[in-house]
Amino acid sequence: MEPRWVVVAAVALVVLALALVLALRRRSRPPRAVVAAAPPPTATDRLRRGLVATRERLLGQLDAVLARGPDDADRVYPELEEALVAADVGVRTAGELVARVRGRVGRGGDAGGIRAAVRDEVAAILGADSPPAPTARPWVVLVLGVNGVGKTTTIGKLAALHAAAGRRVLMVAGDTFRAAAIDQLGIWAERTGAELVRQGPGANPAAVAFDGMKAAIARGVDVVLVDTAGRLHTRANLMEELRKMQRVVAREVAGASHETLLVLDATTGQNAIAQARTFTDAIGVTGIVLTKLDGTARGGVVIAIRKETGLPIRYVGVGEAVDDLRPFDAGQFTAALFDGDRGGAKGSVFS
């Protein structure tokens, strides 16, 4: 029988051999590639992504028009106008825009010059307005819109924006005709850390607004977002209810409402302009929130709304995520609409 030390030595040699083999295997493996994390999308990236359908329609037709040869000089501007109308810029706005482009470029311009002129004119129409920073406390925002435009969701996302800026937010569930709207605001209140004033379904909306203003003052909140019932813009009696809420808010908080935002669905195209005019005549809208821009090729309606109503675009929605509702920036919007394309038509358009 072999001595014990021989067995121990053999086991030790086996262990050392295994360790050596494993070490050699590790050395022979290629180093793992380190993949850098992609940077988060910028606001312009999100807009560009949301406007892809509009951009493809508008720039696709624009490029086709600008690719015309010298013999087609007289057709370029009428077809340019048709391309803008197809993107829901609107007949009147498209006509005025093309007239200004023609006045700037004339018959001697090339494709690049016309494209740049269209871009500049769109930027000029959209202007440089941005949502005003709250200057009063509480800063009261009344939110209006017909059913189905995403009004209550917009209020939740506005609460998230203000909360991210360090503001204390109170939401008022003034849409008492829909129990689901009250419950939905409750979910958004929990999600954003906002406070909520609510009553049961069927309660008087003006009474809920009254409670909301009293609570806002007592609690010292910074921003109050007041939901209202969705209604057809052609129903006079329902519009009178909105005016009553507005009077209650103004009586309880000096200077309120400080903003009256109308939420419009971009997919409705030119009908959104009719809604904006009617609500403005009845209530006095101060700004537009345009939702669902990511779901339509009719995003040119942004230009038409701004031009034909004179109302500033305050926010745009380009997706379902909370941060896909962004303060409107005319420069970012124009860049997303015109600069995210395939490079555009090249060469001379006119002789």
What are these regions (language model features)?
Residues M1-L13:
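Feature marks short, highly hydrophobic, charge-poor N-terminal signal-anchor/signal peptide-like helices
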Residues R27-R49:
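Short juxtamembrane segments adjacent to a transmembrane helix
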Residues Q184, N204-R219, H233-G344:
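Conserved catalytic-core segment of NTP-binding enzymes
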Residues L225-D227, V263-L264:
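Structural recognition of the conserved hydrophobic beta-strand(s) that form the central parallel beta-sheet
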Residues A229-R231:
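Short glycine-rich anion-binding loops that position phosphate/pyrophosphate groups of nucleotides
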